[in-house]
Amino acid sequence: MMKTAVMFILVVVISLTYSSEEQEVARTYCGRHLANILAYVCFGVEKRGGAQYAPYWQETYLRSRKGPGVVDECCFRPCKLEVLKSFFFFFCD
């Protein structure tokens, strides 16, 4: 009986631990915030200034990618970090 109670409590605790893990929330990223999050994804740092990499990113994007852009995917509608990471090879060198 005692072993059953301990096992039950253990299962409940483990279940609560896994269910309480933070789920990534989709967010919108526009303007400077989009530039900052792209810099973070690319370089692992937060940018202090404006969009200093934006001209390079825009030029690379126009040459390399067909279809919806990062603004379409993450500014006009919410996106998750995984979507931003899918643009990694187009914005990060």
Curated annotation (Swiss-Prot):
GO CC aspect terms: extracellular space
Subcellular location: Secreted
GO biological process: cell population proliferation; insulin-like growth factor receptor signaling pathway; negative regulation of apoptotic process; positive regulation of cell population proliferation; positive regulation of phosphatidylinositol 3-kinase/protein kinase B signal transduction
An annotated Gene Ontology molecular function: growth factor activity
Superkingdom of the source species: Eukaryota
Position of the signal peptide: 1-22
Propeptide section residues: 49-64
Matching Pfam families: Insulin (PF00049)
Other notes: Silk worm has two kinds of PTTH: 4K-PTTH and 22K-PTTH; there are many forms of 4K-PTTH.
Subunit-level organization: Heterodimer of a B chain and an A chain linked by two disulfide bonds.
Function statement: Brain peptide responsible for activation of prothoracic glands to produce ecdysone in insects.
Stated name of the protein: Bombyxin B-11
Organism: Bombyx mori
